A protein has these predicted regions:
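Twin-arginine (Tat) signal peptide motif
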Residues: 1-7, 364, 431-437
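N-terminal binding-site loop/beta-alpha segment at the start of enzyme catalytic domains
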Residues: 2-132, 192, 198
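Short, acidic/polar
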Residues: 83-97, 145-159, 213-220, 296-299
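Active-site groove signature of glycoside hydrolases
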Residues: 160-179
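Ferredoxin-like iron-sulfur electron-transfer modules
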Residues: 341-363, 408-433, 452-453, 458-468
């Protein structure tokens, strides 16, 4: 789908919303405790109106356009110093979200060191089962035997304390047809899941995709055989036509799914948080257009505007994240053609920044050598966005020119913040290039190369610390 086609679509969506009020709450079959419109202006600071819903074409049910991604719950320590999910925080966020119309919750057996499903299930089970939809996955990455896959599938029912899963996904397919067949076809799991769908224990069957355009098109050919109920893709205004690495541009994926009438679930609307932490110059431009709105809200409006989008997932760790997204989607104000044109230019600009395309999913973790891989990338990207490009001035002169002074400030800021943000035992210089992490990265980042690049930058800055 070309940008001009999206502009036409967004313009039409905005016009229809204005004429009919479809951007507000919907009346029938909404899983929000029976309320037509969930939430209003009040303690969460929403501007007014209820949550925007999309209609699931299979059962005609209403799904909140804001979906809760359960991969980023707040962590704490137990009495033995082990990382565990802060259950009290999860309960509070789930209660708040449900009360304000969010009814789609997405998890996986591998999220948060395998703790996400149980913590999410405990929080949700305190509410009526018909007030929310559960989405989870068959995440059989390392052991795709039928025995292990069946155990993982059965465990999800136990973790969520339920007799049915509303949305079930084959997790992160797209590396190769061989990988897809090994994980799901040859072991008989896909045939089994199709029967589970017929029996009603799975209500919607789909998959999440990470891969290139060729693989996307190949897998989509299976729709005639398997009749996918939905497909989850990475979509945001940066990846619409500027996807990195092996990933397919979102405009192509969305366009092909829309043609076939397959509902789309959106992941990474903020691109791992990077679209909430933009270069200062771009932040100024966004604030000039809409001073009262958050930087993140632009990305969420982009992801939610297309009408074939069923829900947009957001991993909301803290209450302020949830409240900001509720303001954006209660109700959603679709992008205008002018908005889309502007974000297209922002994306063009962002594609020129030397960022590492890490989304912070942590699939690469833990590193056997203790490196905080996402932390190293996040710090580097943050410094680039804030203008600390730490490019050494041309020439060998030690003269204190303005350019040299700027370099000294940037160098010091980078080094000080690096040591504060990343423990020394977790820094990039510990990478030996074993490559264990690479096969797990859905963005296909050459992780050792990027870590070595960051380490080289750090060492270069430290070597020059006595010169200036």
């Amino acid at each position: 789908m070309e940008r001009r086609d999206f502009i036409k679509m967004t313009g039409a969506a905005a016009a229809v919303a204005a004429a009919t009020g479809i951007a507000g709450g919907c009346a029938s079959k909404v899983k929000n405790g029976g309320n037509d419109k969930a939430g209003s202006a009040g303690d969460n600071g929403m501007a007014g109106g209820g949550m925007t819903y999309r209609t699931d074409p299979k059962f005609g049910e209403k799904v909140s356009v804001l979906g809760y991604g359960c991969m980023r719950w707040q962590m704490t320590k137990d009495e033995n110093g082990k990382d565990i999910i802060d259950q009290e925080s999860v309960n509070e966020l789930v209660d708040y979200a449900l009360a304000r119309g969010v009814n789609y919750f997405d998890s996986s057996p591998v999220y948060l060191q395998g703790q996400s499903e149980a913590a999410s299930g405990l929080a949700l089970s305190r509410h009526p089962r018909d007030s929310y939809y559960i989405a989870t996955k068959l995440s059989n990455f390392s052991d795709w035997s039928r025995e292990n896959s069946m155990l993982m599938y059965r465990k999800s029912f136990e973790n969520f304390r339920t007799d049915h899963l509303d949305y079930y996904l084959l997790h992160s397919i797209g590396r190769s047809i061989e990988d897809f067949e090994n994980r799901y076809v040859k072991n008989g799991m896909l045939d089994f899941l199709l029967k589970e769908r017929e029996a009603g224990r799975i209500r919607h069957l789909g998959y999440s995709f990470h891969g290139n355009r060729q693989m996307f098109d190949e897998l989509l050919k299976t729709h005639g055989k398997y009749h996918w109920d939905f497909i989850q893709i990475q979509m945001n205004y940066r990846d619409w036509s500027h996807a990195d690495g092996r990933n397919c541009n979102a405009d192509h994926m969305y366009g092909e799914l829309e043609k076939r009438g397959i509902p789309v679930v959106i992941m990474e609307p903020l691109r791992g948080g990077s679209l909430a932490k933009l270069p200062n110059r771009i932040v100024d431009e966004l604030k000039e257009r809409m001073p009262s709105e958050s930087v993140a809200s632009w990305a969420f409006r982009f992801a939610g505007t297309p009408e074939n989008v069923l829900t947009v997932l957001s991993g909301m760790t803290y209450m302020e994240h949830l409240q900001d997204n509720l303001r954006t989607y209660s109700p959603l104000v679709p992008l205008t053609a002018d908005d889309m044109e502007f974000l297209g230019k922002v994306a063009d600009s962002l594609s020129k920044y030397p960022l590492v395309p890490c989304t912070g999913c942590q699939y690469c973790m833990p590193c056997p050598y203790g490196i905080d891989i996402p932390g190293n990338f996040s710090h580097y990207n943050k410094c680039v966005n804030e203008g600390y490009t730490v490019s050494e001035p041309d020439g060998d002169s030690d003269e204190c020119t303005e350019e040299m002074k700027a370099y000294r400030r940037a160098r010091r800021a980078y080094l000080v913040s690096y040591d504060r943000s990343i423990e020394k035992i977790c820094q990039a210089n510990r990478c030996i290039g074993c490559g264990q992490c690479m096969s797990h990265c859905p963005q296909d980042i050459n992780i050792p190369h990027e870590l070595h690049r960051i380490d080289h930058l750090i060492e270069s800055l430290r070597r020059h610390s006595d010169r200036f």
